Design a protein with these regions (language model features):
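Cytosolic regulatory regions of ion transport systems
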Residues: 1-158
Length: 158
């Protein structure tokens, strides 16, 4: 793991030397699921990113609007599994899709769908540890598992 600090003008050079020169800058992000993880994610994103959160629960959408009123996020009440909604909301112009619902299967399938629709970077939250290796084998992108992250942090502090 390596970290680089540079000015904006040298980013293409850094990408070239690490073999990531075709890496896509992420400007448009779509998040499926409006839970606490989504809120923390949006609050830590750079201000130049445009974020859309798709949430099925209307009351949760209202709460998200209140929690994220200072952030550059559009809250959409709908089902992130609805292909026509994804197209209508611009998934084809989205560089990153993040599935953060409480359902691992939904997150995995949503990321597979996003990949097939041309999204280059996908992230799926997979709470069921039994699904992690299967999800990794599907090449859906990044897998987040809170339990394994907590275990790694715990081992690092022992």
């Amino acid at each position: 793991l390596a970290y680089f600090m540079t000015t904006k003008q040298y980013i293409p050079y850094i990408r070239k030397i690490v073999g990531k020169e075709h890496y896509v800058d992420v400007k448009n992000v779509m998040i499926m699921g409006g839970g606490a993880t989504a809120v923390r994610t949006v609050k830590t994103m750079p201000s130049y990113m445009d974020v859309k959160i798709i949430e099925t629960d209307e009351q949760r959408c209202e709460r998200l609007n209140a929690l994220l009123e200072d952030e550059k996020a559009l809250i959409i009440n709908g089902d992130g599994r609805d292909l026509s909604l994804l197209v209508e909301e611009g998934i084809k112009n989205t560089q990153a899709f993040v599935a953060l619902t409480g359902n691992a299967e939904t997150n995995i399938l949503a990321c597979l769908t996003a990949k097939r629709m041309g999204v280059r970077k996908t992230v799926a939250m997979v709470e069921n540890i039994d699904y992690v290796s299967m999800a990794e084998s599907l090449d859906i992108g990044t897998i987040i598992n809170k339990k394994s992250i907590a275990a790694k942090i715990g081992r690092a502090h022992v």
